UniProtKB/Swiss-Prot annotation:
Enzyme kind, highest EC tier: isomerase
Entry's Gene Ontology BP terms: 'de novo' cotranslational protein folding; cell division; chaperone-mediated protein folding; protein transport; protein unfolding
Localization per record: Cytoplasm
Xref: PANTHER family: TRIGGER FACTOR CHAPERONE AND PEPTIDYL-PROLYL CIS/TRANS ISOMERASE, TRIGGER FACTOR-LIKE PROTEIN TIG, CHLOROPLASTIC
Gene Ontology molecular function: any one: ribosome binding
Protein source organism: Akkermansia muciniphila (strain ATCC BAA-835 / DSM 22959 / JCM 33894 / BCRC 81048 / CCUG 64013 / CIP 107961 / Muc)
Name of the molecule in the record: Trigger factor
Catalyzed chemical reaction(s): [protein]-peptidylproline (omega=180) = [protein]-peptidylproline (omega=0)
Lineage: Bacteria, Pseudomonadati, Verrucomicrobiota, Verrucomicrobiia, Verrucomicrobiales
Top-rank taxon: Bacteria
Encoding gene per record: tig
Residues covered by the PPIase FKBP-type domain: 161-255
InterPro entries xref list: PPIase_dom_sf (IPR046357), PPIase_FKBP_dom (IPR001179), Trig_fac (IPR005215), Trigger_fac_C (IPR008880), Trigger_fac_C_sf (IPR037041), Trigger_fac_ribosome-bd_bac (IPR008881), Trigger_fac_ribosome-bd_sf (IPR036611), Trigger_fact/SurA_dom_sf (IPR027304)
């Protein structure tokens, strides 16, 4: 067997292989034996069908299996003979068997880019203070108070932070909005007894603030220009008129900061115990935020340290994934682009730059893992899969089979490895606390 690997500067390598006829004949004979042992053909007992009939009946299938087997052998031999070669994927081969049975194949491989790791220990990062202040606890208490505030009826004009209970109907160009656009528009058509907080941007820009100063029984026509990001494309940029009548004004009543308040928020606890629990929770959140800040700064600095060629096919796959994610985010946020093709075209360049940075960091982290002998154990992988199964309320064995069937186990392993390498780098980083 002859194997030749020619590495190119664009993260590809050409594999050329030739396997002599005597080797291919032995492989062919092994495949024929395998088919003969399993074949069930009319008129013959299992395993007793003449090989000449087997070769004729399954000629196409055995030829394909032989070529696949020979190519796999060529690939594994290439990796054995070139231990420093890091192959991401083998391209579909151009392969053939000549009349004498000699096998030849040529394949373009995508390989990991070659680069020298920069100094990755002692990366300087700046993080916020981990101290939880009394002001932090007070802010958390106020947020909880807002969540359980009550709204009581008042006999006065609506003010900011009040709630106005309104009836409204909506028109476009003098017609009911659904009639004007020719389809239902849901909530925008109108509502009776709608609670509306009197502040900007809770519903549509300028709508809620226009209720300020109105008393129960007052009516007002409120004109709003629909934003260009609105999910109903027919309404973007249009002026809608909301014919609103205030039925009732309610004032926000915040609870007193006492033990009764604490009991509502955290049953069985008094105010001091609630403050202690909040302080512990805030400390945990700050610790997580600091770890995230360290990891973000380290990856950004790693990406800026080196510039090297990346496999174009891998970049394109990453770009595709990023664009898919951006489209899903736009749709889930209610800002679906009117022209999806134009959206993709405009987002592609930004996605490509993001993809290149992601991949540079990925390959560098993989190299750090190899140098520092960082690996993911089978128990760590199992624990993560079990955690995901619990989170998704799935049977563990069924979930494992699902991951294996969909080829997602490797991705989970890589995510865990990336996290372990980043954890290693954060421990090795030079950390400065920003006291501001």
């Amino acid at each position: 067997m002859e194997i030749n690997v020619d590495i190119q500067p664009d993260c590809t390598a050409t594999l050329k292989a030739s396997i002599p006829a005597e080797t291919t004949a032995a492989r062919r004979a092994s495949i024929v034996d395998s088919y003969a042992a399993k074949a069930k053909l009319p008129g013959f007992r299992p395993g007793k069908t003449p090989k000449s009939i087997i070769e004729k009946r399954f000629k196409k299938e055995m030829e394909e299996e032989l070529l696949d087997t020979l190519f796999e052998t060529a690939c594994s031999t290439a990796l054995e003979e070139n231990p420093k070669l890091k192959v991401l994927s083998f391209g579909k081969p151009e392969q053939s068997l000549d009349d004498q049975g000699n096998y030849t194949a040529t394949s373009t491989m995508t390989v990991v880019p070659e680069f020298e790791l920069p100094e990755y220990k002692g990366i300087e990062v700046k993080v916020p203070s981990s101290e939880v202040t009394e002001a932090d606890v007070e802010e958390a208490l106020n947020s909880l108070a807002e969540q359980i505030a009550e709204f009581t009826p008042v006999d006065r004009a609506a003010q900011k932070d009040d709630v106005a209970i309104i009836d409204f109907k909506t028109t476009l160009d003098g017609k009911p909005v659904a009639e004007a656009v020719g389809k239902p528009v849901g909530f925008l058509e109108g509502r009776d007894g709608q609670w509306m907080k009197v502040e900007d941007d809770q519903f549509l820009p300028g709508f809620a603030s226009a209720l300020e100063g109105l008393n129960a029984g007052d009516s007002k026509d409120i004109t709003v220009t629909i934003p260009d990001t609105f999910p109903i494309t027919e309404l973007r940029g249009k002026e809608l008129v909301f014919h609103a009548t205030v039925k009732e004004v309610r004032e926000k009543q915040l609870p007193a900061m006492d033990d009764a308040f604490a009991e509502k928020v955290l049953p069985g606890k008094n105010l001091e115990e609630l403050k202690t629990a909040l302080k512990e929770n805030l400390a945990q959140r700050k610790a997580m935020q600091i770890d995230e800040a360290k990891a973000d700064q380290i990856t950004e600095k790693l990406a800026d340290m080196l510039d090297f060629n990346l496999p174009e096919a891998v970049v394109e796959r990453e770009v595709y994934g990023i664009l898919q994610q951006k489209m899903q985010q736009a749709m889930y946020s209610g800002n679906a682009p009117a022209d999806m093709d134009k959206f993709v075209e405009e987002a592609r360049e930004e996605a490509k730059q993001e993809a290149k940075r992601n991949l540079k960091v990925f390959f560098m982290l993989q190299e750090v893992a190899q140098v520092e002998k960082i690996a993911v154990t089978e128990m760590e992988l199992y624990n993560e899969v079990a955690r995901q199964a619990r989170q998704q309320k799935k049977n563990l064995k069924s979930y494992i089979r699902e991951l294996q069937r969909e080829g997602r186990v490797h991705g989970i392993r890589m995510s865990l490895l990336t996290a372990k390498v980043l954890d290693f780098l954060t421990k090795e980083a030079k950390v400065t606390v920003d006291e501001q």
